[in-house]
Amino acid sequence: MYRSTKGASKARRDQINAEIRNLKELLPLAEADKVRLSYLHIMSLACIYTRKGVFFAGGTPLAGPTGLLSAQELEDIVAALPGFLLVFTAEGKLLYLSESVSEHLGHSMVDLVAQGDSIYDIIDPADHLTVRQQLTMPSALDADRLFRCRFNTSKSLRRQSSGNKLVLIRGRFHAHPPGAYWAGNPVFTAFCAPLEPRPRPGPGPGPGPGPASLFLAMFQSRHAKDLALLDVSESVLIYLGFERSELLCKSWYGLLHPEDLAQASSQHYRLLAESGDIQAEMVVRLQAKHGGWTWIYCMLYSEGPEGPFTANNYPISDTEAWSLRQQLNSEDTQAAYVLGTPAVLPSFSENVFSQEQCSNPLFTPSLGTPRSASFPRAPELGVISTPEELPQPSKELDFSYLPFPARPEPSLQADLSKDLVCTPPYTPHQPGGCAFLFSLHEPFQTHLPPPSSSLQEQLTPSTVTFSEQLTPSSATFPDPLTSSLQGQLTESSARSFEDQLTPCTSSFPDQLLPSTATFPEPLGSPAHEQLTPPSTAFQAHLNSPSQTFPEQLSPNPTKTYFAQEGCSFLYEKLPPSPSSPGNGDCTLLALAQLRGPLSVDVPLVPEGLLTPEASPVKQSFFHYTEKEQNEIDRLIQQISQLAQGVDRPFSAEAGTGGLEPLGGLEPLNPNLSLSGAGPPVLSLDLKPWKCQELDFLVDPDNLFLEETPVEDIFMDLSTPDPNGEWGSGDPEAEVPGGTLSPCNNLSPEDHSFLEDLATYETAFETGVSTFPYEGFADELHQLQSQVQDSFHEDGSGGEPTF
């Protein structure tokens, strides 16, 4: 093995550098670009051109004549395109980048490629995931893919446009040439069109087709500030089927799908409210002449502070529409989170146009435009001569004010079949009407109550909502901008908020929730009036038509009041939002209240029981029937009575009516020397117990309780002497009468029955004692089987322990 020396290392480096310089000379670049290339850039460009040469050399030769256009003519066509061509593999490795990229991104092709040989090196990191998803999405090779991403631009271009450039990419995968490398890396060819349109050359009357239509399906249109069509390119005939003359001076909102009105109006408002170089993007559906709907990716931008809007409309497929809409929604949510502003739909709350300015024929919607009957009167037409007369939107728009639709007057009820001649957002702010005039199609008119229906027909107990209870038919809501809103909420306005605002928006922002609606300050509201429950307040307002809205329900526009009753069920159906009440007035996702204590059914007997009687197990655990339980209780009572009679001395004078215990005996002195032959009697406080007749044990003809039977049963027990001495006396001498007890005449079967009763165990005791538990000691509750025959002086019995 040869040891490396300083001279040998320098020689190898010189050889490598010489080979790199040879590669630089082989690159098809201008000499000015070659001079400023570093060794790393040279090797990167060499890899790109090598992949390009291998791919195009191994591809399928083109069929047909190839001599129609020369190479120079092809280069001129590519340079004239409103975009640049891009070829890269599925893993992102670049194969080709047209020279026209310098006009759109500010970088030359050499500068962009010098950053790396992958497309991810020249794309904004925030869009890497979008591009990767599009490249890995499974589909046919000939299926077009359309997506948008941001390309890195030069410093000078970023200073002009304050950011990277948004580019719309449409391309497809091609069949790969033979080879293991190309089998796993199909080639994607795309045309990239910047979404920042270039100024149109020449003072032409309308937008021309442009070279972009050769690679991208699109048509251009110009709109007034109300989005009425001023001009449109002829290519609209291909995509929508309308002639150019059929769309001039028509409302753009008349072509929109009803579900896309909210998105279009919010972007339209943003263009009007914000100043500067603002562009709006939206994915909407436009109605074609044959009646179908076509997905359009629309890019709107303003030509000047007072000039009209220009729109680039790109027809897209359903899959592309879904992908673009998801991308736009995620970007809007991200921007709202960064800026700290809620992503809600704005609304106009002031008069944008006067009644005289609405007479321009540009505001007339096309046939089939939705209509509305929520406004008291139709606007009068005026004239708009120049764009300079169009008023600017106010910078102080109040979004907390929630207007309520008023009842249509008879003058408008007769003309419900006519189209209203206003398009949002330049709609006259009618008193009591919604901010935008989104007219309804015929199917949506079913939400409107008939003008001739009465209040009893419209308000039934099943249809009365919380919003109706809080807004009686006679309530007045003075408008802070116009005073004509007072006294407008009539009988036909007893609809829910959803029915009133359905044509305006597809989703309700937090400000439009029924329980958080804000109302303007009334001019004269009664004071010291309490908020009653909705069920009683609504009936009270029905009975008093002249009553105005209470002060508690009509705060100033800057405050928000939450109803204390009836709103918890509304919030339980809605997800919590940042503006949801959390101060105790309303309950967010309240849990059901559990009544009574919780109990757990234990399947086994708990361990560690001291005694069976102290067991906390429920009685239902053993599943006794009522009859069995009664029998057990009766047997326990009889056994306890027999045990009481055995442990306690009886009176010498036994009456014929039953057993009478001695209740006046004095306890024995424990210090006495007890040496008698008979068993001692413990000094216990005797309590009077009542005994039950045991007639069921003997023949009914014999009176069992006439004598004292206990002394006859226990013949061997001695009775204490009154002097305190024990002796073995004869029971006949001590018992008056000296007659034997009838118990001596019992049959052997009766004696056996009595013995069984004395040793009987209940089912509960048997079940518990059968299974000993851990920590369970029989000595804790078992009685002594033998009576002590002697006691010590200290009163203790038995043998000494030590």
Swiss-Prot record:
Cellular localisation: Nucleus
Disordered, as annotated region: 470-554
Modifications after synthesis and translation: Ubiquitinated, leading to degradation by the proteosome.
PROSITE patterns reported for this sequence: BHLH (PS50888), PAS (PS50112)
Pfam families associated with the record: bHLH_NPAS4 (PF23183), PAS_3 (PF08447)
Residue ranges of every copy of the PAC domain listed in the record: 280-319
InterPro entries, A to Z: bHLH_dom, bHLH_NPAS4, PAS, PAS-like_dom_sf, PAS_fold_3
Keywords, alphabetical: Activator, Coiled coil, Differentiation, DNA-binding, Neurogenesis, Nucleus, Repeat, Transcription, Transcription regulation, Ubl conjugation
Effect of inactivating the gene: Mice appear anxious and hyperactive, are prone to seizures and have a shortened lifespan compared with their wild-type littermates. Mice show learning and memory deficits: while having intact memories 5 minutes after training, memory is significantly reduced one hour or 24 hours following training, suggesting that both short-term memory and long-term memory are impaired.
Induction: Induced upon calcium influx. Expression is regulated by neuronal activity (at protein level). Induced in CA3 region of the hippocampus after contextual learning. Induced following sensory input in newborn olfactory bulb interneurons. Induced in the medial prefrontal cortex cells of the brain following experiences with positive valence. Induced in pancreatic beta cells in response to calcium influx. Down-regulated by REST. Transcripts are regulated by a subset of miRNAs, such as miR-203, miR-224 and miR-744, that bind to its 3'-UTR region and down-regulate its expression.
Keyword Iron: no
Chain segments annotated as transmembrane: none
Region span, Helix-loop-helix motif: 14-53
Domain bHLH: residue ranges: 1-53
A single GO BP: cellular response to stress
Assembly with partners or alone: Efficient DNA binding requires dimerization with another bHLH protein. Heterodimer; forms a heterodimer with ARNT, ARNT2 or BMAL1.
Identification of the protein by name: Neuronal PAS domain-containing protein 4
Protein's organism: Mus musculus (Mouse)
Gene name per UniProt: Npas4
